[in-house]
Design a protein with these regions (language model features):
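Acidic glycine-/aspartate-rich tracts in secreted/extracellular proteins
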Residues: 4-7, 42, 95-97, 314-317, ...
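Extracellular repeat-rich scaffold modules on cell surfaces
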Residues: 50-53, 60, 66, 208-327
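Extracellular S/T/G-rich loop segment that most often corresponds to the catalytic His/Ser-adjacent loop
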Residues: 1-72, 76, 80
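A structural signal for beta-strand register positions
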Residues: 4, 289, 308, 350-352, ...
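Surface-exposed loop/turn motifs in large extracellular/passenger domains
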Residues: 273-287, 299-303, 330, 343, ...
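Tight coil/turn sites that cap or link beta-strands
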Residues: 306, 314-316, 324, 330-333, ...
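Extracellular beta-strand/loop-rich repeat segments of large surface/secreted proteins
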Residues: 334-415
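C-terminal subdomain of the subtilisin-like protease fold in secreted/lumenal serine endopeptidases
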Residues: 6-7, 11, 26, 76-227, ...
Length: 431
């Protein structure tokens, strides 16, 4: 994961950058967009060992602790995650809602002194626009430019550049105008530590490997790319909405792209070729529980190999939905909650659906021979409920139990199957 230091403010969820929002020394994210996050790195109050006080510093050395600290918080929330998954959380929760000037100014001293102007419009900026951007950036923080004079840079660099022919401008060592996208400048966005502790916000095929690809007979042996979360006995909550990103050639060198020019090389040399047409899904494995509380729109199935998966809304009532993904509960897995799976639930394990006030809602329900559909009645007669919108096919076991409590000898409760399982068509499609 690379870093891009900047100076920015946040208001109403939007990141705003002024003329000096992008640090002059930034190399931007171009060519490394997929694994770059931007973080505050300009004019940071840092500890000074010489004076035992504080000093103002700028640079990636100031941005790095911001990201490292956020990663530590994520690791504290999800101690079972591996390093790749911690990076995924940081990258997918970064704030890409960024407002900035049309032209950003940088200063490149890697080879020879050069002014770099990054612009977002389709047309190359005029001399007047470049001078205005340079002037605003310089006047905002003259000290950052050291010995360099604004007037001398305008006269000897900018004006000289625009007096040259187009071919000469391309070879100019002192002024470069580079057209970019915001992603090429800021990468995946600006670090958002608060959102990061809520878990990943996207399943990204581009950050998976060929080992991520699996098939399941229940889904026609179609190959999908899965992110595997082994909770290792922990309780974890993914509070963010989880979307998806499919394979995108723009993140890869020509040799690894999937177009006509790259396909033969892909077949021979790249394991990533297997990912090119795959949709991302999620596998929950290991002891413990993982709760999905967002409005999740990723396409491929959600598999419960071990432990429990909870699908429930957030405390404010939002989320708790799988919009596109179906759920497969294997024999060592469990499913519970008060959420909604719009597509299909296939239960070969244990399913404890909903409550009496908030049923678990599914589009289609299928239960295999090893499946157990579990209902619990408390001493007041309240019980959980499953709501099926379309079709149901149930094998295996339907279990009815009592909540652990004190019951009088006179306690009794009469229940109809329709009290436990609600079918939208009144039971016509029940098998």
């Amino acid at each position: 994961m690379s870093l891009n230091p900047l100076d920015a403010t946040r208001k109403d969820g939007k990141i705003s950058l002024g003329p000096t929002g992008l640090s002059l020394f930034s190399n931007i994210a171009r060519g490394a967009e997929l694994f770059t996050v931007s973080a505050p790195g300009g004019y940071i109050s840092a500890a000074d060992a010489v004076t035992n006080g504080y000093t103002i510093k700028s640079g990636t050395s100031m941005a790095t602790p911001q990201v490292s600290g956020a990663a530590a918080l994520v690791a504290q929330a999800f101690p079972w995650m591996n390093g790749k998954q911690l990076a995924d959380v940081i990258l997918t929760t970064a704030n890409s809602n960024i407002e900035c000037p049309d032209i950003l100014v940088g200063f490149d001293e890697s080879t020879e002194t050069a002014l770099v102007f990054y612009y977002f419009s389709t047309e190359k900026p005029s001399e007047e626009q470049v001078i205005k951007a340079l002037t605003e950036t310089y006047n905002k923080d003259p000290e950052a430019w050291g010995y360099r004079s604004l007037n001398s840079m305008i006269e000897y660099f900018v004006k000289d550049h625009f007096e040259k022919s187009e071919a000469e401008q391309e070879q100019d060592k002192y002024v470069r105008l580079i057209r970019v996208t915001k992603e090429e400048v800021f990468g995946q966005g600006v670090l958002d530590a608060g959102k990061a502790v809520g878990g990943p916000a996207r399943l990204d095929v581009n950050r998976m490997s060929s080992n991520s690809v699996k098939t399941y007979a229940e889904f026609g042996n179609t190959a999908y790319a899965f992110e595997v979360f082994d909770t290792q006995g922990h309780m974890a909550v993914f509070n963010n909405d989880i979307s998806e990103r499919l394979w995108d050639d723009k993140y890869y060198h020509e040799e690894y792209r999937t177009g006509l020019q790259g396909i033969s090389r892909l077949t021979r040399s790249s394991e990533n070729s297997i990912l090119a047409d795959k949709k991302p899904g999620l596998i929950k494995t290991g002891w413990g529980m993982l709760a999905l509380m967002g409005t999740n729109t990723y396409s491929a199935p959600t598999i419960v190999e071990g432990g429990s998966l909870m699908i429930s809304p957030r405390p404010d009532g939002s989320g708790g939905i799988l919009v596109n993904s179906s759920v497969l509960v294997q024999k060592d897995g469990g499913l519970l909650g008060t959420g909604t799976v719009i597509n299909r639930v296939i239960n070969n394990g244990v399913f404890l659906p909903g409550t009496d006030e908030a049923p678990f809602t599914v589009g289609d329900y299928e239960q295999g021979p090893t499946g157990d559909l579990l209902f619990i009645v408390d001493r007041y007669g309240a019980h959980n409920q499953l709501k099926i919108l379309n079709t149901a096919k149930v094998e295996g076991t339907l279990s009815l139990g009592l909540e652990k409590a004190f019951y009088t000898n006179e306690f009794s409760q009469r229940l109809q199957l329709t009290d436990l399982i609600s079918l939208a068509d009144g039971g016509k499609n029940r098998n």
